[in-house]
């Protein structure tokens, strides 16, 4: 029997509520598909930990986590207690960079039974993968401030794009498109306004696509691309984007399906030199934390992505199918999807449909 060692980190806010539901589904799936998952829970990467220790992570966090096959993460951030730039840069963004999780993969799919906010869209019309560069770009944190607290104050922050960094994420996107039925890849850019880094990104894309003649490609500037996500989401199959643009698109995409509460993501190191991390897109949602109404689907679907990454494809598919079946009934949906189910009832319905 195969065994996998997984680090689980609930984090903050609704992460503490939805992560246990994800674990419940993963454990049951493992039993049904005859493999074993050993979970080790960690209390760091949370604002509770920060308030006790004055930092988000222990000094030996890397040694603790790198022995695991993957990391299953809830959410981080309670801005009223710890500023976001401290909580995020001190935990999640540190994981991404030091474990070289240079791909952020976010599926976007409209499930049967869900009424999306977009008119006349049905299941099959919205089914795409967004590939976001995850370790450099606009979020490189290179820059500084001068003349603080004066009328001369200035702030400068640089975008860093390397040939190595751009090529590897674009290659991942092309390889992903190659496995998809439509074999189509869209490049997100803004080279008509950002005159140095985005033309460089586009040049690398043009060179990379020469290696993949079987892949159909197109390109949109980010301003019209967000409009097309709303007007014509069926146009898109795989979309590759820089760190900032990918961040925007991968929140907009799930919103077009009805809620970001169901959206999963993977922070992936494709070479498996380090563990990859899987988390829901929705964040810690302090406004609903503790109420028991958070949508658990994003966490559960992230678990399915983790199983797929580990090679348990059949088990992964069984979870996605159970989600589809569960969400087709209004009674199993949480409030953000127009239902009345609480977190536990929603996850139990998925469990019963496995």
PLM-predicted stretches and their roles:
Residues 49-149, 153-156, 244:
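N-terminal glycine-rich phosphate/adenylate-binding segment common to multiple enzyme folds
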Residues 22, 26, 205, 299-307, ...:
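Buried hydrophobic packing segments
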Residues 34-58, 229:
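N-terminal beta-loop-helix "entrance" segment that forms/cooperates
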Residues 7-24, 29-30, 150-223, 235:
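Glycine-rich phosphate/diphosphate-binding loop of Rossmann-like nucleotide-binding domains
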Residues 2-6:
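Extreme N-terminal starter segment of soluble prokaryotic enzymes
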């Amino acid at each position: 029997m195969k065994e996998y060692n997984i680090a689980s980190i609930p984090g903050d806010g609704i992460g503490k509520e939805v992560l246990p539901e994800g674990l419940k589904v993963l454990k049951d799936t493992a039993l049904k598909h005859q493999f074993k998952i050993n979970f080790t829970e960690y209390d760091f990467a949370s604002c509770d930990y920060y308030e006790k220790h004055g930092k988000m992570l222990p000094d030996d966090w890397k040694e603790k986590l790198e022995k695991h096959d993957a990391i299953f993460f809830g959410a981080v951030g309670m801005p009223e207690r710890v500023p976001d730039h401290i909580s995020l840069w001190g935990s999640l963004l540190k994981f991404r960079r030091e474990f070289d999780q240079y791909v952020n993969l976010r599926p976007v799919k409209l499930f049967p039974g869900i009424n999306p906010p977009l008119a006349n869209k049905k299941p099959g019309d919205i089914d795409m993968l967004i590939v976001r560069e995850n370790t450099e770009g606009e979020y490189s944190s290179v820059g500084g401030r001068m003349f603080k607290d004066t009328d001369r104050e200035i702030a400068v922050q640089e975008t860093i794009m390397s040939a190595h960094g751009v090529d590897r994420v674009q290659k991942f996107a092309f390889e992903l498109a190659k496995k998809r039925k439509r074999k189509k890849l869209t490049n997100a850019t803004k080279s008509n306004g950002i005159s140095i880094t985005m033309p460089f990104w586009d040049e690398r894309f043009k060179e990379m696509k020469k290696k993949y003649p079987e892949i159909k490609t197109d390109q949109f500037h980010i301003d019209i691309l967000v409009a097309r996500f709303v007007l014509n989401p069926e146009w898109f199959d795989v979309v590759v984007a820089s760190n900032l643009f990918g961040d925007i698109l991968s929140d907009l995409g799930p919103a077009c399906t009805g809620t970001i509460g169901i959206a999963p993501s993977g922070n992936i190191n494709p070479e498996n030199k380090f563990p990859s991390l899987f988390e829901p897109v929705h964040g810690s949602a302090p406004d609903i934390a503790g109420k028991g109404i958070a949508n658990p689907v994003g966490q559960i679907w992230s678990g399915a992505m983790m199983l797929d990454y580990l090679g348990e494809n059949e088990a992964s598919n069984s979870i996605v199918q159970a989600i589809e079946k569960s969400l087709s009934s209004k009674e199993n949906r949480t409030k953000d999807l127009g239902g009345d189910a609480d977190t536990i009832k929603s996850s139990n319905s998925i469990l019963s449909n496995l």
